[in-house]
Amino acid sequence: MNPRRKKRLTLAVALIAGVAAVASLLLYALNSNLNLFYTPYEITHGKNDTGVMPEVGQRIRVGGMVTIGSMKRDPDSLHVEFAVHDSAGGTVFVTYDDLLPDLFREGQGIVAQGVLVESGKLEATEVLAKHDENYMPPEVAEAMGQTHEKPTYNQKALEDK
């Protein structure tokens, strides 16, 4: 092989190796920032279609209703513990060490994002409460078996206001 071909081959191999390294680093970064959505039932029994269960230490989002009577507050700190359930009968216990949203209350729908510390227990870094009685995020509504419909507005009624 002459020196010119050898130089081209070395350059091509280096270029392919560089592209592969960048692609693998990109995939690793995207995978570590991925937050999968689960219902409480899916955390303990696995996804309905695939059977995949979240691993301990994995960052996930959990959506469901706050169980009435399950909220425990620490009087000396912001630490709160509560249970979240769904219509399939699953329950997950959530701990949170920050201010809860103003709309947060027992019996309301929430989405908690955090790390699964053990099976059935989530250490939340963020808790989101739904906006009003009628709104529910589409993924929570689908997971809980309810229909999520967009409100229809009458143009004449809007003009009369």
Curated annotation (Swiss-Prot):
Which InterPro entries does the entry link to? CcmE, CcmE-like_sf, NA-bd_OB-fold
Has keyword Iron-sulfur? no
| Annotated Basic and acidic residues bias | 147-161
Q: Where is this region: Disordered?
A: 142-161
One GO term describing the cellular component: plasma membrane
* Gene Ontology biological process: cytochrome complex assembly
Q: Which Pfam families does the annotation name? A: CcmE
Instruction: List the membrane topology term(s).
Output: Single-pass type II membrane protein
Organism domain of life? Bacteria
The transmembrane segments are 9-29
Where heme binds, per the record, is at 131, 135
Topology feature Periplasmic, residues: 30-161
Keyword list, A-Z: Cell inner membrane, Cell membrane, Cytochrome c-type biogenesis, Heme, Iron, Membrane, Metal-binding, Signal-anchor, Transmembrane, Transmembrane helix
List the GO molecular function terms.
heme binding; metal ion binding
Identify the residue ranges that face the Cytoplasmic compartment according to the record.
Answer: 1-8
| Subcellular localization, as worded in the UniProt entry | Cell inner membrane
PANTHER family in the cross-refs: CYTOCHROME C-TYPE BIOGENESIS PROTEIN CCME HOMOLOG, MITOCHONDRIAL
List the HAMAP family hit by this protein, alphabetically. CcmE
Query: Its function?
Result: Heme chaperone required for the biogenesis of c-type cytochromes. Transiently binds heme delivered by CcmC and transfers the heme to apo-cytochromes in a process facilitated by CcmF and CcmH.
**Family, similarity comment:** Belongs to the CcmE/CycJ family.
This one is known as Cytochrome c-type biogenesis protein CcmE
Tell me which species this is from: Shewanella frigidimarina (strain NCIMB 400)
